[in-house]
Amino acid sequence: MMRIFLFLATNLAVLVIASITLKLLGVDRYTGQNYGSLLVFCAVFGFAGSLISLFISKWMAKMSTRTEIISQPRTRHEQWLLQTVEQLSREAGIKMPEVGIFPAYEANAFATGWNRNDALVAVSQGLLERFSPDEVRAVLAHEIGHVANGDMVTLALIQGVVNTFVMFFARIFGNFVDKAILKNEDGHGIGYFVATIFAELVLGILASIIVMWFSRKREYRADEAGAQLAGTSAMIGALQRLRAEQGLPVHMPDSLKAFGINGSLKHGMAGLFMTHPSLEDRIEALRQRG
């Protein structure tokens, strides 16, 4: 998922904007007096950004990738794509999602939507042109696995929890700086405001490590689902083809890379912020699974 990721940046922006708004309205001076009410208050704002993003995810995905939804197939490839997704969805026990193709040379695909029965699965033009039918089917099975596992909803809920505690502990830190260090006894001063914003940025980046860890775990689960639906050898073959094309630039919007099959490759500390495990690790996990 992401290069210091639009998804993370969006959530941090929500927190910062919320903090500025609360300061300007003077609300913080009341919520900061009681930790119980503060936690509830932060939960409302913390979940707002992630849940709004979840509910508009299909619309945003279509707009940002210029995905063309297949309503009436015009070619045999589109007909095959619809039939394959329909078959995989039926086997996974979910409602047929919308199916689309987005114009990109790199081989990639993504799934999104606010619930498992109102989803979108889209593949890149490059994937359809260069991958074999078995490999494309395995990629589609992986994305159907994301939908069937409810990964989009779970990720949004985890992000909401993370946002809540980032806002909560940032305000506790801001209050400590304002009262204990700056000795401000007259409401919340500028020290509280600056310290809170600083803490939100730092804690938000640290907390994103938790979100990225979960994202990597769910990739393994989606690979397992793909192997169950399309066969282990086909799933491994698709991942090997993706590995062969790993040097190609990825043009998918950062907000959707978390839900694509092919993630960015990072090493060292940057690996903590990867949305996907390495393709080598994913292939090895499938081989061990048998």
Swiss-Prot record:
Name the record gives this protein: Protease HtpX
Annotated GO CC locations: plasma membrane
Location(s) in or outside the cell: Cell inner membrane
Active site: 143
Family to which this protein belongs: Belongs to the peptidase M48B family.
UniProt xrefs under InterPro entries: HtpX_protease, Pept_M48_protease_HtpX, Peptidase_M48
Topology of this chain in the membrane: Multi-pass membrane protein
TM spans (from-to): 4-24, 36-56, 150-170, 193-213
Matching NCBIfam families: PRK05457.1 (NF003965)
Keywords: Cell inner membrane, Cell membrane, Hydrolase, Membrane, Metal-binding, Metalloprotease, Protease, Stress response, Transmembrane, Transmembrane helix, Zinc
PANTHER family referenced in this protein's UniProt entry, alphabetically: PROTEASE HTPX
EC code(s) of this entry: 3.4.24.-
CDD domains: M48B_HtpX_like
GO biological-process terms attached to the record: proteolysis
Requisite cofactors: Zn(2+)
Cofactor note: Binds 1 zinc ion per subunit.
Enzyme's top EC category: hydrolase
Residues at which Zn(2+) binds: 142, 146, 219
A single MF term (Gene Ontology): zinc ion binding
Superkingdom of this protein's organism: Bacteria
